[in-house]
Structures are given as structure tokens and as C-alpha cells.
Design a protein with these regions (language model features):
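Class I SAM-dependent methyltransferase "Motif I" SAM/SAH-binding loop
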Residues: 93-95
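A short glycine-rich, Lys/Arg-flanked "PGG" loop and its adjoining helix->strand segment in the class I
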Residues: 177-189
Length: 315
């Protein structure tokens, strides 16, 4: 799913980068060195990298759909949740419509929000290919996670969802709070907000950013060229933002390597629960995968179902 975000962040936490490491005291100099992290980078450069990382991965919708074509477990989860909670459903970061169209086929009315032009075009094409009854259940709204509005629909959604790490494009506490405030405004009394983000993998976060990882071979769905895919990243441990680079390199060596940026905010479990509570929600269910299993150290995802806290004064 594509993940829209506010262009101007109210808190510049993402720009806090560590300084270049200094030699430690004698008793620490023999310890193994950590892989170099982000820095020293200017505030402006980090902001530019984060902004680019919110857009570039979603500029080629055909490639995006090809890369995630086997991702189905989350769709099954959100379909089951929608069956239990009912519609209409508000979907944040709907992207090209993986989840949207499945929910509409199940008979739910869905308001799908996104801001990435290529993904919105792909979503519209998918909707046009649906049976008429399913297509008519989908309303597409171009909007940002922090400022979206569905006129005439405040307080009307029993369920809001943000699938496939959408909230990892909220880079500051202010952005998280703004997004959750918009969700709260649109939820019906007793309504739920369900979303998933990754459980931070500490070994992955400290990988050497100079190396290439996850090298695989694939055929580009548009050009039909055989490509190598690989990735690496820098990690800002203060802003908790991974600045990821995706490399697309022609196997035959003819032509340049394309580098696509992707930025993701990492949320640790206790922190995430506190952020949700600060925005007037409470976590009513929490899972470690899309098979409804408990969250533990082996999990790759954090799947949360939240409701408005009973004592919240916010609307």
C-alpha cells in the first residue's frame, strides 16, 4: 500500500542524526565496531531523503504490484475483521487497491484514501475492472494521512484500516497524533481502527549500509528486462527512521542501475501503545501476524486493533 504523509512535519525528529563516532576510552577501543550509521548529514538533506522515500517507491505502480503479488495474508486478515466489524470501511493508504477491491467484492462499501498519483491511477483501473456492483461500493479520495477528510462522513465508519506498514510513513509524534485525530473524527461510536507495522528487527537495523542485501533476480513487468534487485539502508536511531535504498540493476549490464528510496519510521511495541493512548485510543487486540497469533519476539509484524478510549475528551 502506498503511504501518504504530511509534507511539512511539525516536529523535526527525523533530522536528529548521530555524529561521526569518536574513539572510545581505552577500555572500549577493543570492542567490535558497529556498522557506520547515518551521518553526519544536514537537517535539510535528511528531510529531503525522508520526503523522497515517501514517494519514490510508489511511482511505478506496475512494479510495486509485481513485487508484492504474493502478499495475501494481510488481505485475508482485514477481510475477516471487516466481516466481524461491518462497514462502511475507511482505508488509509489504499495504494493500488490490494485490500480495497477484496473488501468491495465481499460486499463492503470502502472509502479508499491515497495521494500517490501512480497508485491512484492503478486503483482506478482495478476498480474499473470489477463487476459493476463491487465497483460502485468504492469511493476514491485523494488525500494525505495527516489531513484527509471525507465530507459528510464524520462519525460514520465502524472500521478504519491502514494495511501494510502505512503508518511507517508518519515520521514524528505530531504526524502520528494528527493522523489518529483524523481517524477518530471519522469513526462511528464504538468503531475500531486496525493497522499493522513491522516489529523492529535490531539485527536488520544495524546492517552495514555499504553492503547490498537480499539480492534476487526478476523480470520487470513493464520493460520485460531481467533485473537484479538488492537493498541496503542507513538508520537514524534518534528519529528511528530507516532510509532504505532499493537497487534495480540490468542483469546484462546494459544500462544504469536505478536506485529507489523508501523511508520507514520504526515503532517499538511499548512506544506504539503509548502513542495510540496519547491520541485517545486504547489497544483492544494485538497480534504478531495475520493469523491472529500473539505478538512475541519471533514476530515480523505488529497488528493492532484500537478503539476510542472511554474517557477520551477528543471527539
Amino acid at each position: 500500500m502506498t503511504r501518504a504523509r504530511a509534507r511539512t512535519r511539525s516536529h523535526k525528529q527525523s533530522g536528529h542524526v548521530p555524529r561521526a563516532p569518536r574513539p572510545g576510552p581505552p577500555e572500549t577501543r577493543d570492542r567490535p565496531e558497529r556498522a557506520p550509521r547515518v551521518g553526519p548529514l544536514s537537517q535539510e538533506l535528511v528531510d529531503d531523503l525522508v520526503d523522497a522515500g515517501s514517494r519514490e517507491h510508489y511511482a511505478d505502480a506496475a512494479l510495486y504490484d509485481h513485487e508484492y503479488r504474493r502478499r495475501r495474508a494481510d488481505v485475508t486478515f482485514y477481510r475477516e475483521l471487516a466481516r466481524k466489524r461491518g462497514g462502511p470501511i475507511l482505508e488509509l493508504g489504499a495504494g493500488s487497491g490490494r485490500v480495497t477491491t477484496a473488501l468491495a467484492r465481499d460486499g463492503h462499501r470502502v472509502v479508499a484514501i491515497d495521494r500517490a498519483p501512480a497508485m491512484l491511477d492503478r486503483l482506478r483501473a482495478r476498480v474499473a475492472a470489477l463487476p459493476r456492483a463491487a465497483a460502485e461500493r468504492i469511493e476514491i479520495v485523494e488525500g494525505d494521512l495527516c489531513t484527509f477528510d471525507v465530507p459528510g462522513a464524520h462519525g460514520s465508519f465502524p472500521l478504519a484500516i491502514a494495511a501494510f506498514n502505512v503508518l511507517e510513513h508518519l515520521y514524528t509524534r505530531g504526524e502520528v497524533h494528527a493522523c489518529l485525530a483524523r481517524v477518530a473524527e471519522h469513526l462511528a461510536p464504538g468503531g475500531a481502527f486496525a493497522f499493522d507495522v513491522q516489529l523492529p528487527d535490531l539485527a536488520w537495523l544495524v546492517r552495514d549500509p555499504a553492503k547490498r542485501w537480499a539480492r534476487t533476480r526478476f523480470t520487470d513487468p513493464t520493460t520485460k528486462r531481467v533485473m537484479f534487485y538488492s537493498t541496503n539502508h542507513d538508520y537514524d536511531p534518534v528519529g528511528q527512521i530507516a532510509l532504505i535504498r532499493l537497487y534495480y540493476e540490468p542483469v546484462d549490464g546494459k544500462g544504469p542501475t536505478r536506485v529507489v528510496k523508501l523511508s520507514q519510521r520504526k515503532f517499538f511495541p511499548a512506544e506504539l501503545e503509548a502513542l495510540v493512548a496519547h491520541a485517545g485510543f486504547r489497544v483492544v487486540e494485538r497480534y504478531g501476524d495475520f493469523a491472529w497469533r500473539p505478538l512475541d519476539a519471533s514476530a515480523e509484524s505488529q497488528v493492532l486493533i484500537c478503539e476510542r478510549a472511554a474517557n477520551s475528551r477528543r471527539r
